[in-house]
Amino acid sequence: MTKALIVFASMTGTTEGIAEILAQDLRELKIDTLVKECTELYPDEFLDYDICVVATYTYGADGDLPEEAEDFYYDMEEVDLTGKVFGVLGSGDRIYKKFCPAVDDFDEQFEKSHAIRGAEPLKINLSPDQTDKENIKQFARDLVTTSSKVQKPK
């Protein structure tokens, strides 16, 4: 069975909620899915999963990574995720000049780790509305479709 790990950083609960919506969508697609907060694990735990996801918020007007996610972000530099499928999604506020740059930062970090993009980065303004929930469902489908095309080691 295909396994997914969703790692999240959430200050107000919004991004955790987004991670849970994605987890439910993946489970409906028959993916064994685990959701964990970024402070509860190290990036090398992604090695035990086929699909690797980060759900993050962006902090402040300068578009910073969440402080609690910084160690996880930098530790990702040490992990080779070749053959793993990844996706990044998160929330931000369009009032700021930079919208969800933490999503882009994690997306780039996955690329540097040699993972395979399974879905385009998904950015949600504030909290998910019905359209966002449909986009999350499509994000899940894209991850699963890409994962099904990746040659699994024997």
Feature map (PLM): residue ranges:
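FMN-binding flavodoxin-like domain, especially the glycine-rich phosphate-binding loop
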Residues: 2-3, 14-17, 25, 29, ...
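Short acidic active-site motifs
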Residues: 40-45
